[in-house]
């Protein structure tokens, strides 16, 4: 519920989270779930005894945080309904993080460093995951048309360009928001791809249009198309 004595701000506080979830998986899942509302500055989740089952998500805009609080209240996250409110203050979130806050400028430099490293690794490989090739050491844009994109509409979606650490729960949190969702299918031997089944092709089309290009990580916009049948 919205807490009357805490003014709306860009940071939200989440509790009643399943404590068995590993820290990095939890942060990825929260990023995946809440980035639909707007750009995120940070996701903080700690596994210290006092802070288990809690997390903080920081948006760039207060309106995004407000939408998240309203729409995700009691959302079943890893089998437990989330309790969400505005964080007491941004400084409170930083304090709770026990010094883990990274200033925006420093964080941007770190992201640039990671991106340079990723490109360097790609230049040493003849191809990228999911079959995408490289051109002059740079990845091919993920939305280039392929035969998969021209499949006739049906109730099963083919998802690729996923981070290799993506799991079925992370995808379910996204796709079950749309009517007719049935199941997620992933192939262990082929990380980075998944199949999502809906009851009919109208419902699968709605989900595809809504989630096309959704970024599970800043470097991985999802590519969604109809599956071959």
UniProtKB/Swiss-Prot annotation:
Source organism superkingdom: Eukaryota
Record-level GO BP terms: cold acclimation; mRNA processing; RNA splicing
Disulfide bonds: none
Comp. bias regions, Polar residues: 123-137
Annotated localization: Nucleus, Cajal body; Nucleus, Nucleoplasm; Cytoplasm
Major subcellular location class: nucleus
Keywords for the protein's UniProt record, in alphabetical order: Cytoplasm, mRNA processing, mRNA splicing, Nucleus, Repeat, Ribonucleoprotein, RNA-binding, Spliceosome
InterPro entries noted in UniProt: Nucleotide-bd_a/b_plait_sf, RBD_domain_sf, RRM_dom
GO MF annotations, alphabetized: RNA binding
Bias-annotated ranges (Basic and acidic residues): 104-122
Domain RRM: 10-89, 155-229
Keyword field contains Ligase: no
Region (Disordered): 104-150
GO cellular component, one term: cytoplasm
Family under the similarity heading: Belongs to the RRM U1 A/B'' family.
Function: Involved in nuclear pre-mRNA splicing.
Quaternary context: Component of the spliceosome where it is associated with snRNP U2.
Name recorded for this polypeptide: U2 small nuclear ribonucleoprotein B'' 2
Source organism of this protein record: Arabidopsis thaliana (Mouse-ear cress)
């Amino acid at each position: 519920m919205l807490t009357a004595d805490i003014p709306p701000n860009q940071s939200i506080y989440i509790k009643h989270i399943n404590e068995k979830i590993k820290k990095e998986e939890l942060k990825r899942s929260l990023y995946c779930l809440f980035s639909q509302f707007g750009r995120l500055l940070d996701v903080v989740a700690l596994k210290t005894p006092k802070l288990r089952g809690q997390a903080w998500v920081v948006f760039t805009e207060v309106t995004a945080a407000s939408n998240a609080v309203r729409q995700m209240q009691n959302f079943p996250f890893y089998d437990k309904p989330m309790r969400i409110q505005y964080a007491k203050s941004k400084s409170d979130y930083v304090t709770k993080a026990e010094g883990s806050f990274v200033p925006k400028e420093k964080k941007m430099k770190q992201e640039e460093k990671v991106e340079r490293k990723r490109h360097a690794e790609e230049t040493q490989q003849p191809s990228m995951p999911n079959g995408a090739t490289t051109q002059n050491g740079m990845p091919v844009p993920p939305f280039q048309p392929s035969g998969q994109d021209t499949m006739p509409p049906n109730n099963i979606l083919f998802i690729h360009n996923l981070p290799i650490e993506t799991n079925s729960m992370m995808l379910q949190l996204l796709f079950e928001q749309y009517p007719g969702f049935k199941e997620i299918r992933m192939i262990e031997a082929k990380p980075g791809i998944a199949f999502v089944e809906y009851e009919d092709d109208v419902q699968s089309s709605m989900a595809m249009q809504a989630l096309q290009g959704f970024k599970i990580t800043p470097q991985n916009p999802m590519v969604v198309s109809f599956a071959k049948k």
